[in-house]
A protein has these predicted regions:
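A conserved acidic, glycine/proline-rich C-terminal tail/linker
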Residues: 199-220
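Catalytic-core "active-site belt" of small-molecule-metabolizing enzymes
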Residues: 1-198, 212
Length: 220
């Protein structure tokens, strides 16, 4: 199935849910497939992991896809771009931009063992934050019929990050507001609290849930 995903991306095939004998039965299977898929892509591109994405951080999106938690994915080092980068649409099947608050991990957070990380642990481990975009490729998915386990297996559609200037985290990051403009016209607005109430809660979920490697200094 991981090889099939790679082929779909290589040919820019339309996103299709895995079904029948290939149906993904639970979230554990979904993340196992994700790791296999990403491992192949890393091997092909001679790349490494630079960090993680966290998706479905709003209750509305979780309800839409029938899941009660966020989802995660890996970000590859060669897919990190700096502000001002030019991205070719032809490199994607259907590229999308998602506005993000990007955090930079300032000290290692080893994999959870006996005690889960608290909010204060996360807050003290983050060295700086940046506005940015996540690049996704939904491959013309039918949003009325998305299997969340297939989405997770497909690395949650992540195709990289565009990173702005990092600054020390504001005292009230939950209250920070952002505006997306196109040609001077406001398209959308949002605030830090839209992400699980505070962006650091999303990082807390990630540190406690997803990664066997832990979060390392320098990770996004």
């Amino acid at each position: 199935m991981a090889s099939s995903l790679c082929s779909q991306h290589d040919t820019q095939a339309i996103f299709q849910n895995f079904s029948g004998e290939n149906k993904i039965l639970d979230i554990e299977e979904a993340y196992a497939l994700q790791k296999q898929f990403v491992d192949i892509r890393l091997s092909q591109s001679k790349d490494e992991i630079a960090g993680y994405k966290i998706g479905l951080t709003s209750a509305r999106m979780q309800r839409l896809l029938g899941i009660d938690s966020p989802i995660g994915g890996f970000v590859q080092k060669k897919e990190i771009r700096l502000s001002g980068a030019v991205v070719k649409k032809s490199s994607f099947s259907k590229v999308g931009l998602e506005c993000e608050i990007i955090v930079l991990i300032g000290r290692d957070l080893p994999p959870v063992r006996d005690k889960k990380y608290e909010f204060d642990d996360i807050e003290s481990s983050i060295s700086s934050v940046s506005p940015g975009f996540e690049l996704i490729d939904d491959r013309h998915a039918d949003y009325k019929d998305i299997d969340v386990y297939t989405l997770v297996g497909d690395n949650s559609w992540n195709e990289g990050l565009v990173v702005g200037e990092f600054v020390e985290s504001p005292v009230d990051l939950a209250g920070v507001r952002g505006m997306l403009e196109r040609n001077g016209v406001c398209i959308e607005t949002g605030k830090g609290a839209d992400v699980l109430g505070h962006p650091f809660y999303a990082v807390q979920w990630l540190a406690n849930t997803l990664t066997d490697r832990g979060l390392k200094e320098g990770d996004y």
